[in-house]
Amino acid sequence: MELQEVLHMNEGEGDTSYAKNASYNLALAKVKPFLEQCIRELLRANLPNINKCIKVADLGCASGPNTLLTVRDIVQSIDKVGQEEKNELERPTIQIFLNDLFQNDFNSVFKLLPSFYRKLEKENGRKIGSCLISAMPGSFYGRLFPEESMHFLHSCYSVHWLSQVPSGLVIELGIGANKGSIYSSKGCRPPVQKAYLDQFTKDFTTFLRIHSKELFSRGRMLLTCICKVDEFDEPNPLDLLDMAINDLIVEGLLEEEKLDSFNIPFFTPSAEEVKCIVEEEGSCEILYLETFKAHYDAAFSIDDDYPVTSHEQIKAEYVASLIRSVYEPILASHFGEAIMPDLFHRLAKHAAKVLHMGKGCYNNLIISLAKKPEKSDV
């Protein structure tokens, strides 16, 4: 089965769907001030036609209500900054393209649009028709828009996904090179980590080269991804998956060869690795780059009627459900659907242990980029 056929969130609105389990979380809330600053710089740059129609794309938008929460933040930021900077001007139309792979459940977003538009009108005073949302399916490692046609490109929790499993893992190192893990975890051998870094470098370079061409000169990108900081990082969601899969092997419910032959196309770069790639590619300048921590259960709320002793387990089950909604399609394609309930039951146990220790944070990186002006524009 082709990777792009399974590289999507759980579809629909069922108990394990991304639409039901994903919600506005602390990580998105932390991104919003950076988003507003990025929009402020964008509006001050006086790009072509920006006072009439701002063209925006959300790359790797996923599906369900969470997608429109991100769109809401973008629209609110544009309106807020626009009022602060140019309050004498009429609000520009905002055209937003939602991008993800062809298998993404775009329909779960489209059917929410009528109520979303009404809410924008009621809460933000944006007349229906002044914000236009459409889909642009396809890999963001390929061309999506005409040259110099976009003002702002946004991507949240997407660029850590690679275009493919690093070829070096199989071609150069052999099928079982990454024993005991599904990605480039801290305990992986250096050649495995290098293979993943090489693939990320190739992919992120392609991403920057292609999409910088789609931006107007001095257009902006704002990218957020999971990252690594040092060897003392707390377990991230993929580490929890590693633990749960290894539990199934120890219990005899899964063959070790199944794990050794599977690698997920996911890489957590360091801030320095991202910085070096941007500088080497050369089409954009870094305006700011920061890291921050977000908690597994940042979006979780609980009724006070629950006994305190049950909070950790309930939170852990929430964490497991959220991780399942993101990773189940690609995991089920390799390990089989039948083992999924057992896998995520064990993941919830590991999440509970991590939460009990007062841990459960993962590192995030946010970077704001501006396309360098052409020499003729300087």
Curated annotation (Swiss-Prot):
One of its GO terms (biological process) is alkaloid metabolic process. Theobromine binds at residues 157, 160-161, 362. It is an enzyme of class 2 (transferase). InterPro entries: MeTrfase_7, MeTrfase_capping, SAM-dependent_MTases_sf. Its EC number is 2.1.1.159. Binds 1 Mg(2+) ion per subunit. S-adenosyl-L-homocysteine binds at residues 18, 61, 66, 100-101, 139-140, 156. It is found in: Cytoplasm. Gene3D superfamilies: Methyltransferase, alpha-helical capping domain (1.10.1200.270), Vaccinia Virus protein VP39 (3.40.50.150). The keyword Metal-binding applies. It catalyses: 7-methylxanthine + S-adenosyl-L-methionine = theobromine + S-adenosyl-L-homocysteine + H(+). One of its GO terms (cellular component) is cytoplasm. Involved in the biosynthesis of caffeine. Catalyzes the conversion of 7-methylxanthine (7mX) to theobromine and of paraxanthine to caffeine. This is 7-methylxanthine methyltransferase 1. The gene is MXMT1.
